[in-house]
C-alpha cells in the first residue's frame, strides 16, 4: 500500500499539479507537503485500495465456490430436506474441517467483496466530482456529452471514433444522474464538449507552443477532445464490470446463511459464473486506468485550473524524438512477452494450488486415517513454494 501511495501521488500530480512553480521555463517542486497532501492523490488512493479489496474478495468467492461445488459433484456433501449433510472423503483429506474452511472462505470473500465495492463507489463518486471540476473535458468525453445537460447516458450510438458530435446520438439516458455525480443535486447542468472546447482554446491556445520540446509538432492545432470511443466505453466498462458481480456476492451469502441450504448449488452454470467472476474486478481496474490516462489527453500534465496555467505539458512533448518506431515496437514486444510468460506461470501455479486444496496449506488436517496422503510431499508442500 505504501508503494501504491507514492505511485499514485506522482500520477495525481500529473492529473492535478500542486506544490510547484515555473522557474526558467520548467516546473520546480516548492512544497513537498502540498504534493503529498494533494486531495486527488488521497481520493485516488482510496479508490485503488478499495478496488483491490474487491478483487481479493472476488478471488476468494470464486475459489471457495468451486471447492464447495466440487465436494457436491463428487458426492461428498448432499442436501437433504433443504439442509446440507456434510460428508467426508479420504481423498485429499476432504473432511468436515475442509468443508468449514471453504464455507467460511466463501462468506468472508463475499463480505470483503461487498465492502470493497461500497468503498469503490464512495471514492469513485468523490473522484468524479473532482474530475468534473479539474478535468471537465474528461467527463464530457466519458458521457459523449456534446451539449450541456443533467442526464447520464446509458447508451449512445453512432461513430464515436469519428470524434464528431454530428455522428453520435444518445438514445437512452437517465435524467439528473450526471448532475448528481457532479454536484450532488439533480438540476445543475454539466458542461458539454461544444461548450468546453472554446473555453479550453481561449485559456490554453489553439496551437502547440513554438518550443523545441514539441519538435516538428510545434505550431500544430491542438485537439482538446480525448478519444470518445475509449473514454465512453472505458468508463462504462469500469463501472459495469465492478458492479455486475455484486448480486453474485449477495447470492453467495444468501445460499450459505445459517437457516438456508448451507452450501452452493450443484449447478455447473453457477460454478462457471463464480470462477469467471474472478476476472471482472481485474478488468474493471484495467479499464479504469485506461480511461484515466486516455481521458486526460491531449495533456500528459493537466493544468490546475486554480493554479499556474503555465504548469502543463502536452502529450506531444512527451514523445522521445531520439527513439525510433522500431525501438518502441521492440520494447513493447519484449515487455509483452515477459509479462505474458509471467502470466502463464502465475495462472498455472494458481490452478495447481487450488486443486491441491486445504491439505496443501494446512497439513495439520491430515492426521491418522489420512496419514498415507500426508506422506505425499508433492501435495503436502505445494504451498510452501507458493508463498
PLM regions: where:
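Polytopic transmembrane helical bundles with strong interfacial aromatic enrichment
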Residues: 1-387
Amino acid at each position: 500500500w505504501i508503494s501504491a501511495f507514492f505511485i499514485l501521488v506522482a500520477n495525481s500530480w500529473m492529473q492535478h499539479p500542486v506544490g510547484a512553480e515555473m522557474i526558467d521555463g520548467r516546473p520546480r517542486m516548492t512544497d513537498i507537503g502540498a504534493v503529498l497532501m494533494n486531495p486527488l492523490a488521497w481520493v485516488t488512493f482510496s479508490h485503488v485500495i478499495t478496488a483491490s479489496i474487491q478483487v481479493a474478495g472476488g478471488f476468494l468467492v470464486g475459489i471457495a465456490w468451486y471447492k464447495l461445488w466440487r465436494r457436491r459433484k463428487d458426492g461428498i456433501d448432499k442436501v437433504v430436506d433443504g439442509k446440507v449433510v456434510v460428508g467426508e472423503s479420504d481423498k485429499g483429506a476432504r473432511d468436515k474441517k475442509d468443508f468449514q474452511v471453504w464455507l467460511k472462505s466463501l462468506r468472508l470473500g463475499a463480505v470483503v467483496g461487498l465492502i470493497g465495492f461500497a468503498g469503490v463507489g464512495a471514492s469513485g463518486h468523490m473522484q468524479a466530482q473532482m474530475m468534473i471540476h479539474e478535468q471537465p473535458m474528461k467527463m464530457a468525453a466519458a458521457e459523449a456529452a456534446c451539449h450541456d445537460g443533467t442526464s447520464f447516458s446509458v447508451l449512445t450510438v453512432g461513430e464515436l471514433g469519428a470524434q464528431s458530435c454530428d455522428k453520435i446520438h444518445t438514445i437512452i439516458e437517465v435524467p439528473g444522474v450526471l448532475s448528481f455525480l457532479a454536484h450532488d443535486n439533480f438540476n445543475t447542468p454539466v458542461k458539454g464538449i461544444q461548450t468546453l472546447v472554446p473555453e479550453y482554446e481561449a485559456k490554453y491556445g489553439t496551437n502547440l507552443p513554438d518550443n523545441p520540446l514539441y519538435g516538428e509538432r510545434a505550431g500544430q492545432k491542438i485537439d482538446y477532445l480525448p478519444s470518445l470511443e475509449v473514454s465512453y466505453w472505458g468508463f462504462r466498462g469500469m463501472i459495469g464490470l465492478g458492479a455486475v458481480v455484486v448480486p453474485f456476492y449477495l447470492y453467495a451469502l444468501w445460499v450459505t446463511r445459517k437457516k438456508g441450504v448451507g452450501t452452493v448449488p450443484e449447478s455447473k452454470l453457477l460454478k462457471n459464473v463464480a470462477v469467471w467472476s474472478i476476472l471482472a474486478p481485474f478488468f474493471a481496474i484495467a479499464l479504469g486506468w485506461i480511461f484515466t490516462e486516455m481521458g486526460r489527453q491531449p495533456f500528459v500534465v493537466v493544468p490546475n485550473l486554480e493554479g499556474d496555467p503555465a504548469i502543463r505539458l502536452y502529450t506531444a512533448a512527451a514523445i522521445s524524438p531520439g527513439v525510433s518506431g522500431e525501438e518502441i515496437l521492440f520494447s513493447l514486444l519484449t515487455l509483452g512477452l515477459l509479462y505474458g510468460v509471467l502470466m502463464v506461470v502465475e495462472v498455472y501455479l494458481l490452478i495447481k494450488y487450488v486443486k491441491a486444496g486445504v491439505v496443501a496449506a494446512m497439513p495439520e488436517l491430515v492426521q491418522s486415517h489420512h496419514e498415507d496422503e500426508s506422506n505425499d510431499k508433492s501435495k503436502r508442500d505445494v504451498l510452501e513454494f507458493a508463498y
